[in-house]
Amino acid sequence: MKLLNPYKFKHFYLNKYFISIIKSKTYFISYNYKYKALWFRTYKVASRTIDDMLKTNCEDGSYIYGSDMAYLPNMFKDYFKFSFVRNPESRFISAWKDKVLRQNYFHFSNKEYEKMKDLDYFINWVKTLDIENCDEHLRSQLALVDVDNMDFVGKFENFEEDFQFVLDRLNIKDYKMEFLNQGIKKEFELTDTQREEIHKIYKKDFEHFYS
C-alpha cells in the first residue's frame, strides 16, 4: 500500500482548499520542503533547469511542483523565496517560436493558426489579452512573482552566476548545472515597430526588472 505523501497532503489541502478561499492572488510556486525554498516560476526562463535542480536528493517527496495557487507569505518567513526573469523581448520571441511555430499550443483554428505564424499578427493578438492574467507563457513576469516577498530575483541573461548563487544559498553541492530544453538558438531581429509594441505590452516588466 502506497503511503500518503505528507508534503503533498499539506500543500494541496492547505493551499488549494483553504488559503485559496481567503486569498485571491495566485502564483505558480514550486515548494522544496527539504531545502526550505519557494521558487516562483516564470515560464520561458530556464524553468526545466531550475526544476531539475530543486529535485536534487528529494526522493522523499519533499519537492512539490505546485499548480497555480494562493499562498500565505507569513507561513514561509524562513524559506528562501526566489525567481528568475528574462528580458521581455527574448522571452516573447521564445514563447512565439515554441508555442506557435513549433506547435499550436493555444489551439487556434487552422486558419487563425496560419496567421499567428506572422509575428506582427501574433503581437496584435497578444495586445488584446489581459497580460496580468493570461496564459502563463505570455503573462507579465511581474504578475508571476511576489516581488514584495522575494529574497532573490536572478536574470536569465546572467543565469550561470545567478543560478550558482541559488545553489550556494540552498547548500546544494552535488548538482552539475546544465541547460535543459535547449534547442538550436537563432538570433531573431525585431523591427523597431515590433520592439516598441512588445515594450508597450510589457511596460511594467521593463520598468521593474530591466529599467
Predicted regions and their residues:
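Membrane-interface amphipathic segments in extracytoplasmic regions
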Residues: M1-S211
